[in-house]
Amino acid sequence: MGWWLFPILGYFIGSIPFSYLIPKWLKGIDVRKVGSGNVGATNAIRTTGPAVGGICLLLDALKGFFPVFITITFSGDSKIVSLTAIATVLGHDFPIFMKFKGGKGVASTLGIIFCLSWPTGLVFTLTWLVIVMLTKYASLGSLVALYVSALLGYLLKGYDTGMLFLILAVLSTLRHSENIQRLLNGTERKVNLFKR
């Protein structure tokens, strides 16, 4: 099996827009037209509530987990694993099925982190939850959790994993540029995890 098939598989799996499909099927809501307009789990939670949004979050995380798991199982080469992980997140961010307008890669990155270092995934989740419960800013929680995970990935799993997590954190930071500006301006949208 050619090594290049793994990143391609990752991109196409990453491109499946669960955070668009699930709200559309279950609630009749087009997340592109409500909330932030972002096709991601946070906007799904914000606009459809924690139950439907939670399903989106889980599925977006799983589409990060499985391509990397498959690559580890059938290849095991750390460079191919990293390329597959990056391609998967790029698929989520720029999905071919949605005219390349996707999410910000946080949930998919979380799935990748759990696949490569589950303790780091737990720390990511706890960090995100604490920050979001305290501030109501999902974007702030995501950014802090991503960089904490990059450091922890390096400490627990070594250079290759830490560098991969750092690259994914930078990709997500670039996708969060508007959120960062709104955080600085005090105009960032807030999210309540427990009610719509």
UniProtKB/Swiss-Prot annotation:
For biological process, the GO terms are:
phospholipid biosynthetic process
State which residue ranges cross the membrane: 2-22, 52-72, 80-100, 112-132, 137-156
Q: Which UniProt keywords apply?
A: Cell inner membrane, Cell membrane, Lipid biosynthesis, Lipid metabolism, Membrane, Phospholipid biosynthesis, Phospholipid metabolism, Transferase, Transmembrane, Transmembrane helix
> What HAMAP family does its record include?
PlsY
The UniProt catalytic activity note for this protein reads:
an acyl phosphate + sn-glycerol 3-phosphate = a 1-acyl-sn-glycero-3-phosphate + phosphate
Organism the protein comes from: Thermotoga maritima (strain ATCC 43589 / DSM 3109 / JCM 10099 / NBRC 100826 / MSB8)
Claim: Cell membrane is one of the keywords in the record: yes
Topology relative to the lipid bilayer, per the entry, is: Multi-pass membrane protein
Which compartment or compartments is the protein found in? Cell inner membrane
Give one Pfam family, short name only.
G3P_acyltransf
EC number(s) stated in the UniProt entry for this protein: 2.3.1.275
Q: What is this protein called?
A: Glycerol-3-phosphate acyltransferase 2
Q: What class of enzyme is it?
A: transferase
Give the CC-aspect GO terms. plasma membrane
Does the keyword Chaperone feature in the UniProt annotation? no
